[in-house]
Design a protein with these regions (language model features):
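Interdomain "pre-motor" coupling segment immediately N-terminal to P-loop NTPase/helicase cores
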Residues: 1-25
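P-loop NTPase Walker A phosphate-binding motif
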Residues: 85-99
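Short glycine-rich substrate-engagement loop in P-loop NTPases that contacts/grips substrate
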Residues: 43-52, 95-134, 150
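Pre-Walker A (pre-P-loop) alpha-helix and adjacent loop at the N terminus of AAA/AAA+ ATPase modules
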Residues: 36-73
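Conserved Walker B
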Residues: 135, 142-144
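Walker A/P-loop nucleotide-binding motif
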Residues: 69-87
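Loop/turn-to-beta-strand initiation segments
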Residues: 99-100, 134-137, 166-172
Length: 240
């Protein structure tokens, strides 16, 4: 009986994971495989290694405390430091424990909605948004990746406000920090002037109102480390 019960639980978890729509690239991601090791004898600086360990620890703490925890996670950092790895690891562990979740790529979501406007499409805007708005646990990957037009801001507002009002748990990843460091000037232009390019903040990409809303919805975890994919040459090993 115990064996049959365990098999049934595993089968259910597999079906729930299929519905979670985790991309094949990230199917291997779990906490055990999240490593701060580099190859070829390379090492992180103490600061970078501590940042990665702290991000892992906080994500694991979120999973351990769920559903008692009141806030989701906002994982902030440059490309290649493991934000998506940690987000998927959290989702997979919660699914294993019997919860329901959904992985959603920010840009792909917007493309699906735009495609629904085609008269020949069988889907609708609300049909695309409904599972994203109502999932028990949502991983929204690469927040702010699309240029913030009025339409984009309206869509992200619909999603985040709906989840906020219903107290649904959300894990987000983004490459955009709260504030950008003082930008370095580019070489001098003709005439001796220098042009300084300011990088966008998260508020620039999703709007000040939604950034404020995320303070209430999520605990911010900043991962300050170089791009893992550039630092490590191990074949087949990738982070996002």
């Amino acid at each position: 009986m115990a064996v049959a019960c365990e098999c049934g639980m595993e089968e259910r978890a597999e079906k729930v994971m299929e519905r979670a729509r985790v991309p094949k690239r990230y199917e291997h991601c779990d906490f055990e495989s999240f490593s701060t090791d580099l190859e070829d004898g390379k090492t992180w600086s103490a600061q970078h290694e501590q940042a990665l360990k702290q991000a892992k620890m906080l994500t694991q703490a979120f999973v351990r405390d769920y559903p008692a925890t009141e806030k989701g996670l906002l994982l902030i950092g440059p490309s290649g430091v493991g934000k998506t790895h940690l987000a998927v690891a959290a989702l997979k562990e919660l699914v294993r424990r019997g919860h329901n979740g959904l992985f959603c790529d920010y840009r792909e979501l917007l493309k699906e909605i735009q495609a629904s406007y085609n008269p020949s499409s069988e889907s609708t805007e609300m049909g695309v948004l409904e599972p994203v708005r109502t999932a028990e646990i949502l991983v929204l990957d690469d927040l702010g990746a699309s240029k913030p037009s009025a339409w984009v801001l309206d869509i992200i507002g619909l999603v985040l406000n709906a989840r906020y009002n219903e107290k649904r748990m959300t894990i987000l990843t983004t490459n955009y920090f709260e504030e950008t460091a003082t930008p370095e000037p580019v070489p001098r232009l003709p005439g001796g002037q220098r042009m300084v390019v300011k990088e966008d903040t998260l508020a620039d990409r999703i709007g000040a109102r939604m950034r404020s809303r995320l303070y209430e919805m999520c605990r911010t975890v900043e991962v300050h480390a170089p791009d893992f994919r550039r630092e490590s040459r191990q074949v087949g090993r990738a982070r996002a």
